[in-house]
A protein has these predicted regions:
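N-terminal export/assembly segments and adjacent metallocofactor-ligating motifs
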Residues: 1-16, 24, 32, 36, ...
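Short, basic and Ser/Thr-rich N-terminal targeting/leader segments
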Residues: 41-46, 236-238
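N-terminal single-stranded DNA-binding subdomain of primase/primase-helicase replication proteins
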Residues: 45-67
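Non-catalytic alpha/beta scaffold blocks inside enzyme catalytic domains
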Residues: 348-635, 687-692
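Short, glycine-/polar-rich solvent-exposed loops and beta-turns at beta-strand/coil boundaries
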Residues: 35-44, 66, 179
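Intrinsically disordered, low-complexity coil segments
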Residues: 67-82, 476-483
Length: 692
């Protein structure tokens, strides 16, 4: 550690730390525009100038100078830096004056107003009048896609957006052209950005040059109520903030969570907001003479009860989709047990994961944060760029830092980092496990190898054998103590919670494929599973939020609450227990799903043993205690991996294909979003990758 004095406060800090970071550690506030902790240093805004005692007789850019670059005093005193001296104040005022020379007076009509770094710093270092008498420069706005609006006259050329697309997103969508006062930020030939993370440039932009196009002129930040929650558009559980005004969700922003999403979110997470308002189910419906007709809750429950009374438990099934919370799964499981039904399943894509194999058999055991320590990665049957863009960015970060070798088994993909393509399917994985492929030596030499196993490898008929083979490979590697190489990447937010709860078929029970076959069951309770096709014959009760495929097939519709309208527990792909918080209320007569199931159970004559969400959770925590530990990970046992590897089975030569065909349209909320539909239309174009 090195000693340094900041404004008279002596601190110990790593020698590689910048003066800006040292100042923050000492409690000093240093303004900046171009510097960002997760991007490379550019040093081009000069707003972070400080005075260095004994250094050059001019202010220094604190973001670009490290503590180790400073000389100690003549008697060995620690180097001294001043952040509030007259020299510093005058220098920053000069920089601010130059920045404002060409900046338009757009604050009253700028969407960044109230959240603008330039506004805040102009208050501290700006002047009330300008000495500049020449004409201001104007820059033509650029089209860069349906998500990001540009008003480039406001741009101060901090290059945060350029560095983000090149370094984090890995697409190199944006760049800087021309020189001097003619410099401009643009995309190549003014085409739409291709990254699934492009919305993050809006958060990074310190001025109003890049703003959210769908949110344009919608609200001011001081009008909004802010609720901390999590995202359920994929299985990562990114930390988000939901901003509402009245009953309406207006925008979703990221929250910092170093262990999960750092401070990035995907474009689907951010811009699915309009889907929360469109095509909503706001009242119960009952199918009469082949047509769905609006009904009261009593009429809907009566129709269900009448049908259930004509059959028995073994002819009733329960299916839960990817947006179902743990509380709802628990209520569904209790209702199924009370009716005598063994037919329950939450694995709507047909994955062969099962809780009987132990928790380690279906978790991302190394954890998301553990990717930062991985020294060899093989991706099997997954396209992380489509399935979990934020996790993909983390893999890229690790690859950029250490050039960690990455290999892929499955479909050929356009990822954002260099990788070796080993083959298409299970036979390639088998050859890798036998050591017949050169990359096997790379895995053996690694101390923290990572085998990312996607659902594309597990949904086939040989899915169980593929899982066993991957576990056998993971167990054969010599790894650092405490490291588990097997990492299951899920695509649904409710999948791990369902497996933890044992929401899988009981003895003699049917899985999703079996339940949906014609004539298999008389009644199916479908909770938000809109990606399945239920064949004719069964009476379908759909509990969900949108008029999607599930509602179209239903005989009775019971409207529920979306993830922004209820408090619910979810478990992400690494096994971290998380919770959504209510930011708004369901529309019309829609109700929270647990309350719907509780009321329905009364009418069916099988009252569920809870009368409130708190009571439901008490029973849930008794059944599965680790659900009570919010933001904690209950890890799996390494011995489970060894046992799983011994199961074996025949692996076919079928190719692994990612279950996500269209990143933007994976669930009913996204499919109801016009913004996501626009993005989906553009996504058919080839993806771009940064040139390294």
């Amino acid at each position: 550690m090195a000693k340094i004095k900041i404004d008279g406060v002596e601190i110990d800090i790593a020698p590689e730390a910048t003066l800006l970071q040292a100042a923050e550690a000492a409690g000093a506030e240093v303004p900046r525009f171009c510097f960002h902790e997760r991007l490379s240093v550019a040093g081009n805004c000069r707003m972070c100038l400080v005075e260095v005692k004994g250094g050059p007789p001019k202010p220094q850019a604190s973001c670009a100078m490290a503590v180790r670059d400073l000389r100690p005093g003549p008697n060995g005193e620690p180097p001294e830096v001043f952040t509030k001296s007259p020299m510093v104040k005058k220098a920053r005022e000069g920089v601010m004056e130059f920045l404002l020379i060409n900046h338009p007076l757009d604050c009253p009509i700028c969407d960044q107003g109230g959240e603008c770094d330039l506004q805040d710093q102009a208050m501290a270092y700006g002047v009330d009048s300008t000495r500049y008498k020449e004409n201001k420069r104007a820059v033509e706005d650029k089209y860069i896609g349906p998500l990001v609006k540009t008003i480039m006259t406001r741009c101060i050329q901090c290059t945060r957006c350029v560095r983000f697309t090149a370094e984090v997103a890995g697409t190199g969508d944006m760049g800087l052209i021309s020189r001097g006062e003619d410099v401009e930020i643009t995309t190549y030939l003014e085409t739409a950005m291709a990254s699934e993370l492009q919305g993050n440039v809006v958060d990074l932009c310190p001025v109003g040059a890049l703003t959210s196009k769908p949110y344009e002129f919608t609200a001011r930040p001081w009008e909004l109520s802010k609720t901390e929650s999590i995202d359920i558009m994929d299985a990562l559980g990114s930390s988000i903030r939901v901003d509402t005004r009245g009953k309406e969700v207006l925008r979703i922003l990221p929250r910092i969570n170093e262990a999960v999403n750092e401070e990035w979110i995907s474009d689907k997470t951010r811009h699915v907001v309009d889907g929360l308002k469109s095509q909503r189910l706001d009242r119960p419906y009952v199918r009469v003479a082949g047509k769905l007709k609006p009904a009261s809750w009593g009429e809907a429950f009566a129709a269900i009860a009448a049908k259930v009374k004509t059959t028995t438990g073994p002819k009733i099934g329960f299916i839960a989709g990817d947006l179902t919370s743990v509380e709802e799964l628990h209520a569904l499981k209790l209702l199924a047990a009370s009716l005598g039904s063994p037919h329950i399943d939450a694995r709507v894509d047909g994955t062969k994961l099962h809780p009987a194999n132990g928790r380690a058999s279906y978790l991302f055991n190394a954890t998301i944060e553990g990717i930062d320590q991985a020294d060899a990665i093989v991706i099997v049957g997954s396209n992380p760029r489509r399935e979990a863009p934020v996790l993909n960015a983390r893999i890229r970060k690790r690859w950029l830092k250490s050039k960690v070798p990455v290999a892929v088994i499955g479909e050929q993909m356009n990822l954002t980092y260099d990788h070796a393509y080993l083959g298409a399917g299970g036979q390639t994985l088998s050859a890798l496990a036998r050591g017949e492929i050169a990359f096997a030596e790379t895995l053996k030499a690694a101390k923290n190898p990572l085998i990312i196993l996607g659902q594309g490898a597990l949904v086939g008929a040989d899915g169980a054998a593929v899982l066993s083979l991957a576990a056998k490979l993971a167990a054969s590697l010599t790894v650092t103590e405490g490291w588990n190489a097997l990492a299951i990447l899920h695509t649904g937010a409710s999948r791990v919670g369902g497996l933890d709860l044992g929401f899988v078929p009981g003895e003699g029970g049917l899985d999703v494929a079996g339940q949906t076959k014609a004539g298999a069951l008389d009644v199916i309770f479908n909770h938000s599973a809109d990606e399945i096709a239920i064949e004719p014959g069964a009476f379908v009760v759909y509990i969900g939020t949108h008029g999607d495929q599930g509602a179209h097939r239903a005989d009775v519709i019971l409207p529920g609450a979306a993830y922004t309208e209820k408090s619910g527990t979810f478990v992400n792909t690494e096994g971290r227990v998380q919770m959504t918080n209510r930011a708004a209320f369901p529309p019309g007569d829609a109700r929270e799903d647990w309350a719907v199931l509780r009321a329905l159970s009364d009418v069916l004559g099988h009252r569920l043993p809870f009368g409130s969400l708190a009571e439901l959770r008490r029973g849930l925590y008794e059944a599965v205690p680790h659900f009570a530990a919010i933001d904690q990970i209950a890890g799996g046992e390494a011995a489970d991996i060894a046992r799983l590897g011994q199961i074996g089975g025949a692996v076919s030569d079928a190719a692994f294909v990612s279950p996500i065909k269209d990143f933007y349209l994976t669930n009913p909320i996204a499919r109801a979003s016009k913004t996501m539909a626009s993005c989906s239309g553009l996504a058919s174009k080839p993806l771009s990758v940064a040139a390294e």
